[in-house]
Amino acid sequence: MNAGKLILGFSVALAACGSGNKTEKETLPSVDDYQEVAIFNGDSAYMHVAAQVEMGPRVPGSVGHARCLDYITGTFRRYGADTVVEQAFTAEAHTGEVLGLTNVVARYNAAAPRRILIGAHWDTRPWGDMDETREGRSTPIPGANDGGSGVGVILEIARVLQHMPPAIGVDLVLFDGEDYGRSSSWSNDEETWCLGSQYWKSNNGYGGKDARPDYAVVLDMVGGKGARFHREVSSDIHASEVVDRVWDMARSSGYGDTFVNSAGGHIIDDHLSINRAGIPAIVVIESLNQKTNSFNPTWHTHQDDLSAIDRKSLKAVGQTMVNLIYEEGGQAAKQ
């Protein structure tokens, strides 16, 4: 894996060599004049996506699902998380199946009085209900973008946090069971989706000495080719200041063309449960694709494979999140 580099600003003391009659002394910047620079590596995030796809679909109860859980928790531990919690539980799906699910919570700077949350879902759709073929509509999808991309970005964020510890707390939360919902009637079947975050809402452990996050950002389908992210409707309704903060950071980071400052779709996603837990939450998601006027064309199809992933999209989202983390902590990371 090309794990990328953390580049640190530094100053070098120079000895002035010259004649004794030199009247002006060169003024050199001190160490304090330089800022640490945290680089999010899009190639590294891409390799995390590729690793997930290689495991096969990550449908709850499958071999790929079990392998991915080990991969996620092992990566968080390798990247120095203060704590890694596997929140195992069961939930009944709309199919009548009882699913064994696991949310994963990795905490960085866990003792900090302030924190933010960045989340994604790590499961994949059990069937390609938007696929063109009958077989595809009844078999699990690869889930490179829908499932894999958010995880890839978050795991690369974890690597950055290991090498440049944040001044604020950062909770990285991967939800299970997001994509097991009934698609026949979106508005009436909201409760069949986002099973992991629904459970987490009542079992998140915030309270007592643990600080509740100031806000949360959920990343979903953030790796599509040429992806552009519009302001999701419910995010603007419940947490418009957070949307402003993220979109402003994207613009100042050079990704204003990727984060479009206009309204997108109204999406059922894990941010809804987080908002109901009393934490202002938004979702970054491609919801106005230029070809479909909706989600990415590969959504819930077997074309959602590694060829659908764009390193530039991963980089834009990941670097924006990294810059946001250090800006919140007063560390002023730059690209």
Model-derived regions, located:
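Sec-dependent signal peptide recognition
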Residues: N2-G9
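C-terminal motif of bacterial Sec signal peptides marking the signal peptidase cleavage site
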Residues: L14-A16
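N-terminal capping segment at the start of a domain
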Residues: K22-L69, Y79, N293-A308
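Second-shell loop/turn segments in exported
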Residues: V31-I39, V53-V63, A91-A93, R137-G147, ...
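A non-catalytic alpha/beta surface segment that caps or lines the substrate-entry region
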Residues: A51-A111
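Solvent-exposed loop/turn segments at secondary-structure junctions
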Residues: R58-P60, T90-A93, A110-A112, W122-P126, ...
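Acidic/histidine-rich catalytic neighborhood of metal-dependent amide-processing enzymes
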Residues: S138-E241, H266, H271
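Active-site-adjacent substrate-binding region
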Residues: Y215, V222-Q335
